[in-house]
């Protein structure tokens, strides 16, 4: 008999939630061990998608995160069918969480996208919160970290969502003019208008292993060119090989790499070598 989470629990009388299964390879392990490994499968290395709150928890120094602009809410200004209901049903205000934090003592402004809110899509609130985060960084002379996880621009907001591409990119240009760094972390997936704007504009572009990164998805490209793409196409390792990503970093090592980068950007007295 094939072992599943259900029959393991039935046989041993184990309460629900004790076991979990990798979505990629079906490997079964204890939920506690899975969480301690930062939701990465120890067998195949698959990086399970994380909520913005969970990612902040293991990325920044404990107790250092101070959220900003959490009260901003999306509005269905186009009266798009079903959009208002989706907003009301969600427990989140929108697809990004922003705030000030410290990473190994270095002060930063951080924005983390959450794929659980409408596929991490970028609408007016996402664009506004990211721009406000950058403006806060400019005011306080802090470097910026954005962790992306998004399917692209939010269709329910039409051209207003597309406008956020230029809006966020312009804000990052101001950051660069003031000699402040932007570190971009690309997670699975980072696609569409987010990939075509701020996500790929980092002074350092870091990606998690096997993350899907690109504008159009592989299925759309295959249907357009009528050719089958390789499995590695648009994955982070492929982009690193072709110069679009600076470094692919395992989730457990993200803090160490960010510390090295921040040491370089704040002190300017060392060579940056990963």
UniProtKB/Swiss-Prot annotation:
Principal subcellular localisation of the protein: cytoplasm
User: What's its catalytic activity?
Assistant: N(6)-carboxybiotinyl-L-lysyl-[protein] + acetyl-CoA = N(6)-biotinyl-L-lysyl-[protein] + malonyl-CoA
* A GO BP entry: fatty acid biosynthetic process
Q: How is the cofactor bound?
A: Binds 1 zinc ion per subunit.
Q: Does the keyword Zinc apply?
A: yes
Q: What's one Pfam family the UniProt record gives for this protein?
A: Zn_ribbon_ACC
What are this entry's molecular-function GO terms?
acetyl-CoA carboxylase activity; ATP binding; carboxyl- or carbamoyltransferase activity; zinc ion binding
Give the residues the record marks as binding Zn(2+): 22, 25, 41, 44
List its EC numbers.
2.1.3.15
Q: Where in the cell is it found?
A: Cytoplasm
Among SUPFAM superfamilies, the record links this protein to: ClpP/crotonase
Which family does the record claim for this protein? Belongs to the AccD/PCCB family.
On assembly, the entry states:
Acetyl-CoA carboxylase is a heterohexamer composed of biotin carboxyl carrier protein (AccB), biotin carboxylase (AccC) and two subunits each of ACCase subunit alpha (AccA) and ACCase subunit beta (AccD).
Q: Which PANTHER family match?
A: ACETYL-COENZYME A CARBOXYLASE CARBOXYL TRANSFERASE SUBUNIT BETA, CHLOROPLASTIC
Name under which the protein is recorded: Acetyl-coenzyme A carboxylase carboxyl transferase subunit beta
Q: Which organism is it from?
A: Endomicrobium trichonymphae
